[in-house]
Regions:
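Eukaryotic helix-grip
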Residues: 1-199
Length: 199
């Protein structure tokens, strides 16, 4: 069972907030002392177009539109669908959150219904120890899913799941306000990126 499948179908209750067409849910994580966050939103675009903007790859579109991703680096290709990557994130929350980096094993999975998922979790890699100028954060099982909308081929339901340990000395209030806000921006910027593909 992939992390996306588990959190998508989890019966555990979530707290919920709405920002426009985007819903963000959260509850305490079972992986670490923070929260697991779930986002849901409809994006105007075919699943393959949305995936083209979302997929985690060096030199891809993601670094151009996602304000929370500064760089993707491929550390190792395990199989065609499994890689180990380093993600660099910029400072955030008016500089309170300093630049971070994350090393994850990433698995891409396609389903018969046309859904595409990206599943990731933290891992250590000998070529990428903690580095100066970055706080090493840890992604617990997380990812994104592009799900076709029945009867509406030009729309995609995007589900996102994050349970990220930012590490360092950060006030809990900063972390808990940062993630819901950044997730709504994620959906807004993704929608703009997909739209620009078809201009």
């Amino acid at each position: 069972m992939t992390p996306i499948y588990y959190y998508r179908n989890s019966a555990h209750p979530y707290n919920r907030s709405h920002w426009g067409d985007v819903a963000v849910y959260w509850r305490p994580s079972t992986e670490f002392t923070g929260n697991v966050y779930k986002g849901e939103g409809l994006v105007a675009g075919k699943p393959e177009d949305v995936w083209e903007c979302l997929k985690p790859e060096p030199g891809g579109l993601r670094v151009k539109w996602d304000n929370n991703v500064q760089d993707f680096q491929l550390l190792e290709t395990v199989t065609n669908d499994i890689t180990i990557c380093r993600t660099v994130t910029p400072a955030a929350a008016m500089g309170i959150i300093s630049p971070r980096d994350f090393v994850d094993v990433v698995m891409i999975k396609r389903y018969e219904d046309g859904s595409i998922t990206s599943n990731a979790t933290n891992v250590e890699h000998p070529s990428c120890p903690p580095q100066r100028h970055f706080v090493r954060g840890f992604n617990h099982p997380c990812g994104c899913s592009c799900v076709p909308v029945p009867g509406e081929p030009e729309k995609t339901q995007v589900l996102s799941f994050f349970q990220t340990d930012l590490s360092g000395y950060l006030p809990k209030s900063v972390v808990e306000s940062f993630f819901p806000y950044s997730m709504t921006q994620f959906y807004n910027n993704l929608s703009k990126a997909v739209k620009s593909l078809n201009v």
